[in-house]
Amino acid sequence: MPTVKTTASTMKLAIGVGILATIFCLPVRAQTVSKLTLDQAGAQTVLQSARETAQRRNAPSAIAVVDPAGDLLAFQQMDRVRPASADLAIEKARTAARLQRPTAEIEDNINHGRTAFVTADIMALRGGAPIRVNGEVVGAVGVAGLSKETDTDIANTAAAALSPTGETHSMIDGVGVGAK
């Protein structure tokens, strides 16, 4: 009988290996992951919100809107803006998008000794804000003009422009944002 038992054990092992091999060899279906993206209409909505806020405050500004990777989607430099403001606005937007946080937080971290943020390609000046939809960063806006307080306020207002409730984490009906 020991031979039969060994054969039965070997048979069970072979069946188990066969089942596992079948499972691992089955075709795998790709899962579709839907990712929100900021389209041109959405970028223009954010840009327009920033421009209108800046005009109401009589605060000429350079305004940049970027995608999550920091690539420029929309830009405007208002009249009477200092020449350096264009580059500052773009870099503030890129930093906010790539780090997925307002540049004000980065400036605060540096001011409190977190010098790791003092690296190349990080703009540690206030005025950059991520654009969030359903908690997901779909882009960012950067504003450079008169003062860091004004830049921050304009950027935060513009970042909330795609949300009907003014909250940057709210649900929207696809206005300016599409699934990719």
Stretches with model-predicted labels:
Residues 5, 12-27:
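Bacterial N-terminal signal peptides
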Residues 30-180:
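Flexible, solvent-exposed loop/hinge segments and secondary-structure transition points
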